[in-house]
Amino acid sequence: MRRLVALALPLCIAVAWPASAQTTDCSGGVNTSLGVSPPPVPPPAHVAPEVEHLLGDLGGIRTNLENQGIYLLLDATAEFAGNVSGGNKQGATSANQVAFEADIDWQRLAGVTGLSTHVIFVNRSGYSDSILLGDSVAPVQEIYGASGNVLVHLVSAYAELTLLDQRLDIAAGQMNVENDFASSPLYCNFMNNALCGDPKALPAGDLGHSAFPDGVWAGRIRVRLTPDTYVETGVYEVNQGLYTNQYFSTGFQTNMSQDSGVYVPVEFAYEPSIGADRLVGHYKIGFGYDSTLYKSFYSALATVPGQPTPNKSHNMQFWVLVDQMLIRQGAGDQDGIIALAGFAHNNPNVSAFAEQYFVGAIDRGFWRARPQDTIGLLFNYNTMSGTLGAVQTEQAEFGLPFSNGATGVQTHEMVLEANYSIHVYRGVDFRPEFEYVFRPNAQTNIRNAAVLGFKVNVQF
């Protein structure tokens, strides 16, 4: 999900969010003199999300706009979750989001070759069941929070330029790291925030690895080396006020007073299409460096007199992500049995999230009568910083409050998720969910929790 409004409202807005990572494009065409909508022109790649619309073509309005390069999307999501056992407290909550995206292909609209603009706005409401659980490591609803107490919140607004027959792609403006790095359209087949968008250890482990629904000032360049490989890098503002109402999340505010450095990610990807069945895969390896100096957890530990203690350090991140279709069951890139796995690492001296491992599978098209229904299975494992754990152990011994907002010593947490996505109608999906959280908040003093729920998504 992602993009911006640049002219008149119907002219420029394209809203997408981390969950929608499919791509499509804009069309450019001519109106007929008969009052009959012209057929849509095939869109160029990566301009707008390719989705179904509940309201259809709106009497030809949508097709006419897209033929001029204007792509609009209104999207609503509700995530309901209730922990039926375990956690600190039982209860049920709903987290909700309405998103508007506008993507404009300026080549079709004004003849500017390769230029597109993207804007996204959201409104979020509701409450997270993980607050009842007492868990902030892997929230059971990914759609909650970070959008400010406002009616309309700007997520991103940026321009994108493709050159050299789309082998070179440059983007700049208000955007987040998650939009282009360490992410996949497959990840939001799951409701738990451990994976939806990108692996939680990356944005939670470093503010520089910014994520939806907030953007920062940034520039990014991607070079497609061969048809199935690319390398990309960028420079992103690191804002210590990110996700907070005071500095960042209020409406259209982009307060830079809390800037502390820059975040520089680099990612290499290999995207094969194997065999006669074109079994699609994505293999990514990435690295991120945050120039901010963070206070080391070591500085809070008791040390031997005269022994030097490292007080500050930069954070570095590393990730390896893989997904591969094993059996094809339809024409689309996600129509089949797909295995996925990943690993992410932070500097545990300055980041509470040390490492994350996940493995999962998605099965779409297994039922010929319902080709868009999807089964998802995911197992996620997060380890917390051992240095942070040592600090928390000392705090427990002296009866002090725990660091990191914890209520006990944090070590590791595991989450198992299973779901079944039912395609109800065009643009409408309903997904019953089951999640089991082992050691909520990575603590032994919070009971394992069983969570039942569902996710509803409507694309208008």
Predicted segments, located by residue:
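Transmembrane beta-strands of outer-membrane beta-barrel proteins
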Residues: I70-A76, T113-I120, L168-G173, P227, ...
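Outer membrane beta-barrel transmembrane domains
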Residues: F252-S257, E267-A269, G286-M316, R328, ...
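Residue-level signature of outer-membrane beta-barrel architecture
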Residues: L65, A78, I104-R108, E160-L163, ...
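Outer-membrane beta-barrel pore domains and translocons
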Residues: T77-A81, I120-R124, M175-V177, Y236-V238, ...
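Outer-membrane beta-barrel "beta-signal"
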Residues: N448-F460
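Short loop/turn motifs that connect adjacent beta-strands in outer-membrane beta-barrel proteins
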Residues: G56-L72, D105-T117, L164-R167, D228, ...
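Outer membrane beta-barrel
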Residues: G91-G241, S351-Q356, D363-T393
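N-terminal periplasmic/intermembrane-space "pro-region" immediately following the signal or transit peptide
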Residues: W17-E79, N83, K89, Q107-G111
